[in-house]
């Protein structure tokens, strides 16, 4: 089902953003 694929993609992007956010927090 398409929704599952979209959810997976969104989760992947969220993980990427989260990692970036954490990295930024640690470098402060």
Curated annotation (Swiss-Prot):
InterPro entries assigned: Cupiennin
Record carries keyword Secreted: yes
Tissue specificity field: Expressed by the venom gland.
Alphabetical keyword list: Amidation, Secreted, Toxin
Modified residues (Glutamic acid 1-amide): 28
Record carries keyword Thylakoid: no
Broad class of where this protein is predominantly found: secreted
One example GO MF annotation: toxin activity
Cellular compartment(s): Secreted
Gene Ontology terms: biological process: defense response to bacterium
GO cellular component terms attached to this protein's record: extracellular region
Similarity annotation: Belongs to the cationic peptide 04 (cupiennin) family. 01 subfamily.
Protein's name according to its UniProt entry: Short cationic peptide-1c
